[in-house]
Amino acid sequence: MVVSDITFRTVAYAAGRDKESALHNNLVRQAFTQGYLATQGLTIRRLTDKRGDVISLPRLLRDVKSNLRLITREVYVSETGLPYEGDFRPHVRFDQLAGTRSDRRQRRDRIPRRVVDTIESWLDIDEIDEVVDWSHKFLAHAADFQRKSVDLTAISLTMDKIAAAQKAIVRAAEAVSAYILHMPSHMAVVPVYQFSKFWRFDQFVSSETVAEAAKFWNSPEDDRNNWTEGVYEALLSTSAT
């Protein structure tokens, strides 16, 4: 989802820098843009689906909230095989999330529901609803969209909403995974490729534009990799209320 978005933005940037590029071919431009919009709309729609018969973030958060009784301090601290005794990081983190003092620790301490409520609220934003609504219309009236010419300027607002929706999803996923379920945290949102992202891209644009596109990629990549900053602090502010 995130990589697809950065890829589209970078290719669109490269096309804008090279007016003679084959990327301006109407068929290529239309197929690439419609593929991007359909993929983003469907992915965000699926990840934020609130129904109970699907796999999504809202479904996961509801399941976590209804089973918080199972995530006790003892389970949280010792699930990796570490001994329960000791004043190490898992204990301190649980203290902070549960709002308890270190001298009053109990094995059956639990994380309050309001922490999960906060994560759910991060998904309750207009941008997600608007992208989901737009996705419904895109799929229901696909033929109409296919007949329309592609105007990147016209969809820039939609791209901004897609980025906002992605950010909310990433932050919610990081919060529940790394801090509630005590799974590994993400060091980066965008994966580090072990190959050249722009291999043979000079077949579509000039070599100068390839170099510019490579630099352009770094900006949204850095921005997305910072999306998880402050997630834990936001949860702690909830625990303190």
Regions found by a protein language model. Give the residues of each.
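Amphipathic alpha-helical interface segments
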Residues: M1-D126, L152-T241
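Histidine-centered, metal-coordinating catalytic motifs and their short helical/loop contexts
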Residues: W122-K148
